[in-house]
Swiss-Prot record:
Keyword Transferase: no
Protein name stated in the entry: Tol-Pal system protein TolB
UniProt keyword annotations, A-Z: Cell cycle, Cell division, Periplasm, Signal
Similarity field: Belongs to the TolB family.
Function: Part of the Tol-Pal system, which plays a role in outer membrane invagination during cell division and is important for maintaining outer membrane integrity.
The species this protein was found in: Xylella fastidiosa (strain 9a5c)
GO biological process, any: cell division
Superkingdom of this protein's organism: Bacteria
GO cellular component terms, A-Z: periplasmic space
Subunit structure: The Tol-Pal system is composed of five core proteins: the inner membrane proteins TolA, TolQ and TolR, the periplasmic protein TolB and the outer membrane protein Pal. They form a network linking the inner and outer membranes and the peptidoglycan layer.
Major localisation: periplasm
Subcellular location: Periplasm
Amino acid sequence: MTKFPRWLAMLVGLLFPLSALTQQQGLTIDIVGGNTAATPIAVLPMPYHDSVGAPATDVSSVVAADLNRSGQFRTLPLGQIIERPTHGSEIRFPTWQALKQDYIVVGRVLDARQGTYRVEYELFDVRNGKRMLGLAMTARASAMRDVAHQMADAIYEKITGLRGAFFTRIAYVTASGSHGAMRYALMVADSDGYNPQTIVRSAEPLLSPDWSPDGKKLAYVSFEKGGSSIYIQDIATGSRELVSSFRGINAAPSFAPDGHRIALSLSRSGNPEIYVMDLVSKQLIQLTNSFGIDTEPAWSSDGKFIYFTSDRGGRPQIYKVASVGGTATRVTFQGNYNATTSVSYDDKKIVVAQGSGNVYRIAMMDQSSGSTVWNTLSTGSLDESPSFAPNASMVLYAAREGGRGVLYAVSADARVRQRLVSVDSDVREPAWGPYRSVH
């Protein structure tokens, strides 16, 4: 069966058939595959140094899980950790050299009083014994997972030179119930699926969530009024604004890097075209005017260009146009179907849903070398909606397995893949959020 294109399904409000499911909970995660060439690192247990009131979060296990799923690191299994130093002065480096570890992380958790904890940790290069990092963080028990993600970010950046993206959030849509009584929810969770938060619930489809650059708001499409409308909602307060409810199609909102504009697809003048809306004045600028369907805009990091999906040439392909208007140019030429693009932070790469026959997979186009190089990242047959992590080290996407929707996060080299599943609902429409502020 030929897949009903996502970009057209979005415009008319159709979704894949769903099995009977109940209310949604958080996402569970499991690692699929591994990278044997990844950098070996030992993240040692970090014991709590007090008699009562240990935090529920095992900080070291969260750090290890983050590094593992990045695809860049391979942590030493707990059963192979034969010594457990908690300070750098206690490390016997020949032990870890014999275990073929390149790096080691040690630390401890202390009671900082008044309901807070202090985590102290150190990163060492096993080969020369040099301390690369020595930091401490204090937080309440409820924020210990945030602390662990920030630790993983610091370790990742110190070794790779690239900012980590573990202390980030993802947005996604869940769908549950039967055909006669479907329920949808727009959710936000940590990058590893923990700490889910419901942003909005609806009896009608919710589509195309997109993060504001500061991570405080989400734009999305709702069908609660019968037709499609675009809302922007504050994550912390829940307040929301209806920004587009024109006659016809209102679809695919995408925040500009400045946060003051969105690109969107509207059919107010006939065919769906790409527009830019000023969020203060609500003034519209029409960027495209073709006989085909133009939708799914995505901004370049500098805000000068907008990539979008169009079937103006007969089949869906990716094009780009200046954000102030002008002639659109075609970007993708490989294959008969390229849609739903996400652009990396440095504009050197894009990811798309790429179709061949009845198989749709996530593919990345790398232009950093001056020539176009494609790499297939996913392995399913109905994969869609790719979204880059803010450092472009991983890609989040939606897939169909056994008749239901799941999410995957895959490393940019395609060697490590993690599955994020809800036990009681379909999951789809993922969007990886921006970097979060560290307070």
